[in-house]
Each structure stands twice: as C-alpha cells, then as structure tokens.
C-alpha cells in the first residue's frame, strides 16, 4: 500500500515517484537533493 511521491518532492529511488524518475536537483541553498521529476 505504497503511495507514489509527487513531482518536486524528495525521493530515495525512481520507483518511489509517480513519474518513476528521481533525479538530483539543486535547491535554493545550492545543495543537491534527489527529487521526483
């Protein structure tokens, strides 16, 4: 009963995302965080 993570939210793996794609993005602080595409 796992729900998918919406676009723009932090994610551990591709499979966790509704889009099935979790990639590194740079946030406003200049830190790199994996988020759903």
Curated annotation (Swiss-Prot):
<keyword id="KW-0960">Knottin</keyword>
<feature type="disulfide bond">
    <location>
        <begin position="17"/>
        <end position="36"/>
    </location>
</feature>
<feature type="site" description="Critical for insecticidal activity">
    <location>
        <position position="35"/>
    </location>
</feature>
<keyword id="KW-0800">Toxin</keyword>
<dbReference type="GO" id="GO:0090729">
    <property type="term" value="F:toxin activity"/>
</dbReference>
<keyword id="KW-0964">Secreted</keyword>
<dbReference type="GO" id="GO:0006952">
    <property type="term" value="P:defense response"/>
</dbReference>
<keyword id="KW-1218">Voltage-gated calcium channel impairing toxin</keyword>
<dbReference type="Pfam" id="PF06357">
    <property type="entry name" value="Omega-toxin"/>
</dbReference>
<dbReference type="InterPro" id="IPR018071">
    <property type="entry name" value="Omega-atracotox_CS"/>
</dbReference>
<comment type="function">
    <text>Inhibits insect, but not mammalian, voltage-gated calcium channels (Cav).</text>
</comment>
<dbReference type="GO" id="GO:0019855">
    <property type="term" value="F:calcium channel inhibitor activity"/>
</dbReference>
<feature type="disulfide bond">
    <location>
        <begin position="11"/>
        <end position="22"/>
    </location>
</feature>
<feature type="disulfide bond">
    <location>
        <begin position="4"/>
        <end position="18"/>
    </location>
</feature>
<comment type="similarity">
    <text>Belongs to the neurotoxin 08 (Shiva) family. 01 (omega toxin) subfamily.</text>
</comment>
<keyword id="KW-0872">Ion channel impairing toxin</keyword>
<feature type="site" description="Critical for insecticidal activity">
    <location>
        <position position="10"/>
    </location>
</feature>
<keyword id="KW-1015">Disulfide bond</keyword>
<keyword id="KW-0528">Neurotoxin</keyword>
<protein>
    <recommendedName>
        <fullName>Omega-hexatoxin-Hv1b</fullName>
    </recommendedName>
</protein>
<dbReference type="GO" id="GO:0005576">
    <property type="term" value="C:extracellular region"/>
</dbReference>
<feature type="site" description="Critical for insecticidal activity">
    <location>
        <position position="27"/>
    </location>
</feature>
<keyword id="KW-0108">Calcium channel impairing toxin</keyword>
<dbReference type="InterPro" id="IPR009415">
    <property type="entry name" value="Omega-atracotox"/>
</dbReference>
């Amino acid at each position: 009963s796992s729900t998918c993570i919406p676009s723009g939210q932090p994610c551990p793996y591709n499979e966790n995302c509704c889009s099935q794609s979790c990639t590194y993005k740079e946030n406003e602080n200049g830190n790199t965080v994996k988020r759903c595409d």
